[in-house]
């Protein structure tokens, strides 16, 4: 089990269409508003880790009001979440209401008062609970004060503490890892002139505050991991950004997910980037699911007897559609059944070896059936890619995948034409 502690927020999205401006002010007139509710802040982190299959205790404070009850009910709906939520009559539940016109945010209304700080000590005293990681989600709403003493206890217990900070880093002294964004890095430390300068500034802060790692998020620029050993850059994939709300929470959850699965910190950073990318391509506050972080497998198949420019173009374009490109080729016996005894020209070992030389190809599999249906069912790829001599309804296994992509043929190139010229 992991513990998520911090400022829990109710995110409200009021959305509707707008076709005209108000005559009273230069603002859109929105009609037919629909309202949706999502967990935000530390509650969003918890929903993301729980959505990824991690048993998660969430510790926070809500007001004794309708919004607090609603937030608790949303959290309680996930069976991987254990609630440790307190209620107060002195402050209202923190609510962020976003007004959306045609999917564009035009205003945000925040309802909040500063909460008193909560501590980890009471959680450490819970009998029977053994936390592998503690995730601190600080939105600077009062719940998280200076927790260096608690972090010291956590370290003594062998618990790694990861912090998403919103205050000066001295408040998180003794944490295992802090994850500021670039703006926070510049505000609480100083603005670096280049990556080497960032390394020096970051390492000085790590030493000063007894923190092992600093993971700086750079938006579309990826992430930078700083430790006493140095600095490492991680690139982010190019994606169409729909909504950045809660993306930092999702990336933090992706990081914890990787660590909880026994992956290295660097491998977990890659998952954090992927989680953030998934979040920003979805509307509102997105909650991750386990399938979101698995490799997006692209699948294509064929004989690939005599490799030509058309094959190369298809493979290169297919690779761009996902994380891993798997190429399945017919065995020699399968080719003979389909194309006659004169084929293949190159045996299956030669064809597979040739395909493995292309950097865009991650895996080559030889299948012995007449079609790759059983293999597709086993691999569960997200996308099947075929050449332009197919239509989508002709593609074997199309009902097993999320998407079928047809790539236009490279004119003038085909194995049949090449063999015809040789025979002439």
Q: Which residues does each PLM region occupy?
A:
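Nucleotidyltransferase catalytic core that binds NTPs
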Residues: 290-424
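Ribokinase/PfkB-type carbohydrate-kinase core domain
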Residues: 1-19, 34-240, 260-293
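Short, conserved phosphate/pyrophosphate- and ester-handling motifs at nucleotide-, phospho-/glycolipid
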Residues: 181, 217, 248-249, 308
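Divalent-cation-assisted or electrostatically stabilized phosphate/pyrophosphate-binding catalytic cores
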Residues: 26-33
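Active-site metal-binding loops of divalent metal-dependent hydrolases
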Residues: 7-8, 139, 250, 303-304, ...
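Hydrophobic, well-ordered secondary-structure elements that form the walls
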Residues: 248, 255, 268, 355, ...
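Short glycine/threonine-rich catalytic loop with a Thr-x-Gly-x-Asp
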Residues: 236-255, 412
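Short active-site segment of divalent metal-dependent hydrolases/proteases
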Residues: 10, 251-252, 311
């Amino acid at each position: 089990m992991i513990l998520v502690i911090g400022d829990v927020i109710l995110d409200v999205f009021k959305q509707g269409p707008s076709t005209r401006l108000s005559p009273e002010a230069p603002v859109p007139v929105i009609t037919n508003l629909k309202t949706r509710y999502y967990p935000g802040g530390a509650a969003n982190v918890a929903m993301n880790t729980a959505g990824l299959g991690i048993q998660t205790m969430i510790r926070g404070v809500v007001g004794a009001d309708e919004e607090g009850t609603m937030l608790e009910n949303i959290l309680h709906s996930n069976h991987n979440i254990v609630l440790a939520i307190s209620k107060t009559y002195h402050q209202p539940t923190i609510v962020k209401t976003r007004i959306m016109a045609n999917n564009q945010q035009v205003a945000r209304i925040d309802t909040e008062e500063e909460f008193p700080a909560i501590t980890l000590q009471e959680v450490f005293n819970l009998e029977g609970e053994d936390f592998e990681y503690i995730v601190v989600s600080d939105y600077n709403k009062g719940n998280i004060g200076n927790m260096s003493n608690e972090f010291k206890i956590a370290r003594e217990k062998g618990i790694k503490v990861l912090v998403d900070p919103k205050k000066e880093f001295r408040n998180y002294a003794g944490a295992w890892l802090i994850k500021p964004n670039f703006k926070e890095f510049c505000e609480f430390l100083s603005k670096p002139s280049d990556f080497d300068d960032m390394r020096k500034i970051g390492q000085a802060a790590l030493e000063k505050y007894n923190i092992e790692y600093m993971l700086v998020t750079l938006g579309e620029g990826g992430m930078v991991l700083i430790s006493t050993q140095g600095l490492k850059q991680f690139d982010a994939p190019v994606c169409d950004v729909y909504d950045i709300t809660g993306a930092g929470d999702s990336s933090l959850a992706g990081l914890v997910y990787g660590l909880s699965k026994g992956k290295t910190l660097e491998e977990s950073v890659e998952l954090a980037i992927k989680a953030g990318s998934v979040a920003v391509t979805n509307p509102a506050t997105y909650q991750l699911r386990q399938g979101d972080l698995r490799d997006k497998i692209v699948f294509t198949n064929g004989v690939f007897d005599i490799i030509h420019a058309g094959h190369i173009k298809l493979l290169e374009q297919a690779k761009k559609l996902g994380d891993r490109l798997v190429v399945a080729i017919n065995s020699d016996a399968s080719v003979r059944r389909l194309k006659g005894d004169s084929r293949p020209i190159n045996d299956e070992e030669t064809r597979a070896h040739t395909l493995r030389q292309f950097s865009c190809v991650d895996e080559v599999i030889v299948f012995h059936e007449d079609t790759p249906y059983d293999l597709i069912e086993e691999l569960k790829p997200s996308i099947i890619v075929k050449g332009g001599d197919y239509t989508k309804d002709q593609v074997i296994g199309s009902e097993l995948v999320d998407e079928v992509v047809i790539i236009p043929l490279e004119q003038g190139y085909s194995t049949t034409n090449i063999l015809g010229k040789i025979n002439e």
